[in-house]
Amino acid sequence: MTKQLLTLRVNGEPRTIAADPHHTLLEVLREELGLTGTKHGCELGECGACTVLVDGVPILACLTLPTLVGDSEVTTVEGLASAEALHPLQIAFAEEGAAQCGYCTPGMLMTAKALLDTTARPTRAQIASAISGNLCRCTGYTAIYEAIEKAAASEGGAGASLRAQGPLPLPLRKAGGTNATGAQLP
């Protein structure tokens, strides 16, 4: 099949790629752009591991064709942190032990970011409702709820100097979508 030229805005930068028109946004992000923080999960839209933000709204990248988001801003877990600091959600997930195996964490972080962008101080019920489409088989969700509450309560300064202190501890790497060696999780 003939590849189609696509221009996407991903994590604040325009990216032009040639992709198969039947590929999903998940496949384009991972295989064409090398952004492997977004995970293959069920590929049926049931687990939330592939959640990214499109214009600030969480969507399932496994069910979305990239041609549908060409004029939108796509944010992946790699776009959460700045060059200087991790996002407060990433810090809170690490501190609260909400990133157990780390596989669901990128999708969970993106859903939580969308919630906090629209609801400054969400209730536990609002958090539970927001992340209800993100499955985690390791944590039991309490640590995830607490991490989101902690990030909501922060002033945005959490983790401001962590990037300059050398290699990140394992929980912080997992909260950013990488494994013990710093390589992206599959």
PLM region descriptions:
Residues 1-163, 170-173, 179-186:
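Signature of N-terminal electron-transfer/Fe-S-associated modules in redox systems
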